[in-house]
Structure formats: structure tokens, C-alpha cells
Design a protein with these regions (language model features):
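Catalytic core of membrane glycerolipid acyltransferases/transacylases, capturing the structured
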Residues: 124-141, 261-321
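Generic beta-sheet signal
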Residues: 5-9, 110, 177, 263-269, ...
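C-terminal cap/substrate-recognition subdomain and adjoining C-terminal extension
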Residues: 2-4, 79-80, 86-239, 243
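Membrane-anchoring hydrophobic helices of lipid-metabolizing enzymes
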Residues: 75-94, 222-266, 271, 275-279, ...
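Non-catalytic C-terminal accessory region of glycerolipid acyltransferases
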Residues: 229-236, 327-466
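Hydrophobic/aromatic ligand-binding patch that stacks against planar heteroaromatic rings
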Residues: 124, 188-189, 208, 283, ...
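Hydrophobic "anchor" residues
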Residues: 14-15, 145, 348
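Active-site neighborhood of HAD-like aspartate-dependent phosphohydrolases
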Residues: 2-53
Length: 466
């Protein structure tokens, strides 16, 4: 018989945003199993766990705490486990669900491996569609816990032993399996599988992962995004996204009141320059929002810029394949409350097309809006090409006479989703309406103006409309 692969997930700080125990504790209180007790001290303990992860002493205390469960009614514990489900499910990281589905599609078995008592963790594992739940089992007698632990304490090497026993009994090869955990104490399990991943790692696991070359992930963010001290790079660098720190441009922002303060939406802007992403980043920094930018594959394939784009959570688009993967990734980002930024033109127009009064867009933004129901916020950019024209390898840096750059935000649109073509026309018309009057008038450009719309070293036809 051919062995199968499994994807093994830890629970606290891996699948969940924090610890499950505060939620279970409240449910146990409501069912009359335990008293409210604990007060501020308990909150401090849970807060430390959420930020730094588990410690040897805290886990030994957890092991000993099994003795205090003697006499707990199994029926009441089961009721508490079910009562806790809605709050627990709300704490599951959005990209954890995406990752689990990817493993399902590959035919992997899904396994939840946690120190949490089986009576509590089992219903959650079932609700999430896990194939197995490997959790600490407390001894039972006459409808109550008896204060003992039966089998392994599912932590550290005890977790590895539980996984190995289950794998052997179910014809699963750990040499083909994956494991995800936040804890340094799960290193034995991570070392035993083919594909270990440190998720939201505690400091020691983060160091170990770097030394071993294991991937690092945060399941509240898209794959590739890196977090430091609980914050992603976009958030950490936001104070640096200040127009005053860019003396080669004079920025004018208008319509900031049209930017939603929360929830996902699609930001659509026209494309005139390599400087456009900077202008949009400054705009969203003013709004305090995190953004997922759709960009062409050439950006993501570049040695340094590509790495930065992935770390910032950008979405790679390979227009040659026609794949819907970028659309699905953008839809997931919107569902988690992020802003998705798209330039529907797809690229900076060249030649005469750059000066056309009517903007032409691709269908992706309209399709995304129709698929998700997300609002579209149009943004007009003007003057960015004077800072960094397509013909220049680097931006101009004229601090004596910096060009004016206008960033104008319009009212949100709610497209109908019936026709991607018509919705695209609506979006592009809304962007055009935000631009200065001169943008909507026919213009006969000079050869120098045309040359600025082509890449460096271009020697072909200047008056092309492509």
C-alpha cells in the first residue's frame, strides 16, 4: 500500500491568533465546571503567551493541572467545548484555512496536534474538517475526569511520539509530510517531517528556523509576508512614508475622506510612471491601511525588488498564462480586510497611447469587484512621470524645482458585476474624471515627450499607439 502524506498543525498561536485556553476557560465557567477566578494575573499570563509563546515552566504547570480536573463532568466539558466553537472559529487565521484547503487538494490528511485536552480540542478539529485530532487525553471514570493523563502528554517529544504512533497506524509517511508550529518545543516534530514551517515563531524557533533554512510564515498574512515584533514590514515602515522625506516631488493629496478606514476595497489608479506605486504607498500610509499590490511578474522576478515585493505582500501577475490565481489571491486579501491596489491599464502606455484622453483598462479589476462585491475607489495620478519617466532608469532628483504630483481620490463605486467590459469602462471613466482638464483634451506631443514614454535606449517608432 502506498503511504500517504499529512499536514500537521499546532493549535495555539499557529492556527489561532492567540491561546485557546481563555476561550475554553470562559465556556467552562459558563457551564459551571470552574469558577471565574484568575483576575488580572491570568490576563497577564495569557498576554505573555500570545506575544512570546509557551515556556518550559508554563507547560509543566499545564501538565500538573490535569490533576485539578478530577471530578469535572464530561457532559459539562463537552458542552463547554461546543459553546466555545463560534469564538474559536472566529480566531482561526484566514490564510490557515487557505493553506489547509491547499493540502486537501493535494490529497494530504489534515492533523491537529495540540496539548489541549482532547475533549475540548476534538469538536474544533471536527468543525475545521481535520482528519485526526492528536490531543492530550485525560483519564475518565464514571462520567468525569479522574485527574490523570492517559497516554502521552502531547507536547515536545510527547507530541512527536503521538504523531509517529498515529502515522504508523494510518500508513502515513512523515518523510513526505508537512508540519506547522509556532513553538521551539515542537522542534522534534518539525525535524521529523519533510516540510517543516515555523508559523508566527517564538524567538527561539525563529532563530532555529533561520539556521535550518525552514520557511517562516504568518497565517494572518499572505505567504511571503514577514512580521517583526508582531507587525509586518508595511506597518513598521509607515512612519517613513512621509512626503517630506521625498524632496524630489511636491505632493498634493485630495479626497482623502473617500478612503474607507476599515474593510477591504479595491483601489484603482491610472499608470503614468514607475513612481506611481510610491505615490499610492504615501496615500495609503496617510490612511493607515495595509495594501496588496498587483504587479507584473517581471517585478517579482527581479533579484532585489522582487523579494521586497513578496515581503510586502504583493500579488504576482503573469499575464501570459491567463491564470486566475492572482484574482483568487486578491479576493482572499479583500476578505481579510486588506486594500487591493490595481492599475487596470496593466502597464504604462507607450507613444501616442500615453496621451490618449480616454483611458483603456484590462478587465481584472472589474472581475475582482464583481466576484467579491468589494467597492472600487478610483484614484487619479498626475505628474508622477515628471519625477520618474519610463525613459529613465532612476528617478529625477531636482530638489531645487521638484515637480508637482497630484493624487486625487474619488468616491467609491459599487460595480454591478454583470459585464466586466462595461464595469471596466465605468472604472476608467471615474479615474479620468479625477484628472486635470488637460488630461481629457487631445494633445499633440513633441518627440521628446513621446521618447519619455518608452524604455531607456528605445530607437523604434515614436508615434506608436500601443
Amino acid at each position: 500500500m502506498v503511504s500517504r502524506a499529512a499536514a500537521i498543525f499546532d493549535l495555539d498561536r499557529t492556527l489561532l491568533d492567540g491561546a485557546s485556553w481563555p476561550i475554553y476557560h470562559q465556556a467552562l465557567v459558563q457551564e459551571g465546571v470552574v469558577s471565574a477566578g484568575g483576575g488580572p494575573a491570568l490576563g497577564i499570563v495569557f498576554g505573555l503567551f500570545r506575544g512570546l509563546g509557551e515556556s518550559f515552566l508554563s507547560m509543566q504547570a499545564t501538565r500538573l493541572a490535569a490533576g485539578r480536573t478530577r471530578g469535572w463532568s464530561l457532559a459539562a466539558v463537552d458542552a463547554a467545548a461546543v459553546a466555545a466553537l463560534p469564538e474559536l472559529l472566529a480566531e482561526v487565521h484566514p490564510y490557515a484555512l487557505v493553506l489547509m484547503e491547499e493540502h486537501r487538494q493535494r490529497g494530504d490528511l489534515l492533523v491537529l496536534a495540540t496539548t489541549t485536552p482532547y475533549r475540548l480540542a476534538g469538536p474544533l478539529a471536527q468543525a475545521l474538517g481535520f482528519d485526526a485530532c492528536l490531543a492530550t487525553r485525560y483519564g475518565e471514570v464514571e462520567g468525569a475526569f479522574d485527574g490523570t493523563i492517559e497516554g502521552p502528554f502531547v507536547w515536545n517529544r510527547g507530541k512527536l511520539n503521538a504523531v509517529q504512533s498515529w502515522a504508523s497506524a494510518n500508513n502515513v509517511s512523515l518523510a513526505a509530510s508537512s508540519a506547522y508550529s509556532d513553538s521551539f518545543f515542537d522542534a522534534p516534530l518539525l525535524e521529523a517531517v519533510a516540510h517543516p514551517t515555523a508559523v508566527n515563531p517564538d524567538p527561539r524557533l525563529a532563530l532555529l528556523a533561520v539556521l535550518r533554512g525552514w520557511p517562516l510564515r504568518w497565517l494572518d498574512k499572505p505567504a511571503g509576508v514577514v512580521k517583526l515584533a508582531g507587525r509586518e514590514l508595511q506597518e513598521l515602515t509607515r512612519p517613513l512614508l512621509n512626503p517630506a522625506l521625498l524632496p524630489n516631488a511636491r505632493f498634493h493629496f485630495e479626497g482623502l475622506e473617500h478612503l474607507p478606514s476599515e474593510g477591504g476595497y479595491i483601489l484603482c489608479a491610472n499608470h503614468r510612471s514607475y513612481f506611481d506605486p510610491t505615490a499610492i504607498a504615501l496615500l495609503l500610509a496617510k490612511a493607515g491601511r495595509t495594501c496588496r499590490f498587483l504587479g507584473k511578474k517581471e517585478v517579482f522576478d527581479a533579484p532585489v525588488v522582487g523579494t521586497l515585493a513578496r515581503v510586502l505582500g504583493g500579488i504576482r501577475v503573469d499575464r501570459g498564462t491567463g491564470s486566475d490565481e492572482p484574482l483568487a489571491a486578491a479576493a482572499q486579501a479583500l476578505a481579510t480586510g486588506d486594500v487591493v491596489a490595481i492599475m487596470p491599464q496593466g502597464t504604462i502606455p507607450r507613444g501616442m497611447a500615453f496621451f490618449e484622453p480616454t483611458l483603456k483598462g484590462r478587465l481584472g479589476a472589474a472581475r475582482l469587484a464583481g466576484l467579491t462585491g468589494a467597492a472600487v475607489v478610483p484614484v487619479g495620478l498626475w505628474g508622477t512621470e515628471r519625477v520618474w519617466p519610463r525613459s529613465a532608469r532612476l528617478p529625477h532628483f531636482d530638489v531645487a524645482r521638484p515637480p508637482a504630483v497630484r493624487v486625487i481620490v474619488g468616491e467609491a463605486l459599487q460595480v454591478l458585476g454583470r459585464s466586466a467590459s462595461r464595469d471596466t469602462e465605468t472604472i476608467m471613466a471615474a479615474i479620468t474624471a479625477l484628472l486635470p482638464a488637460e488630461a481629457r483634451q487631445p494633445h499633440q506631443p513633441t518627440d521628446d515627450e513621446l521618447r519619455a514614454t518608452f524604455p531607456p535606449g528605445y530607437h523604434g517608432e515614436l508615434r506608436s499607439r500601443s
